[in-house]
């Protein structure tokens, strides 16, 4: 234990940076969990689609969507999300699953929908990259 204390004392800047980064990671994970936005695996998304209890919103750029997308997904880019709310109103009784490229923007987009009154919002964990990595079907 004394070795750790000596290391921290001798490398104060490095140790402080480590602690700060660790705290930020923990805070970010807590924020995700408290937001009420579910992170779904590609398999869970497939099950939701098979049971027809969810719709998919692909928020990637139009050219990325046109190259490949999950069958049945609607393409609504993030900048148009708030103007497309009327189009989504009819799906309020279903789960809305947000897809992005790698799962990094989907949470914030899902939060925007939640603030607009859509209670059952989730995100594809890992985004389209995770879907493709699982070898699941796509439309071209």
PLM regions and their residue ranges:
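Active-site flanking residues adjacent to catalytic metal/cofactor-binding acidic residues
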Residues: 57
């Amino acid at each position: 234990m004394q070795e750790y204390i000596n290391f921290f004392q001798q490398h104060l800047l490095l140790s402080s940076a480590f602690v700060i980064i660790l705290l930020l990671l923990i805070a970010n994970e807590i924020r995700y969990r408290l937001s009420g936005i579910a992170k779904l695996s590609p398999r869970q998304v497939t099950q939701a689609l098979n049971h027809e209890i969810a719709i998919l919103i692909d928020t990637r750029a139009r050219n990325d969507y046109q190259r490949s997308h999950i069958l049945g997904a609607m393409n609504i880019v993030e900048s148009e999300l708030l103007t497309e709310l009327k189009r989504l109103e009819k799906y309020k009784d279903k789960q809305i699953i947000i897809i992005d490229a790698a799962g990094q923007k989907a949470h914030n987009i899902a939060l925007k929908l939640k603030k607009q009154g859509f209670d059952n919002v989730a995100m594809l964990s890992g985004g389209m990259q995770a879907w493709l990595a699982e070898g699941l079907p796509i439309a071209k």
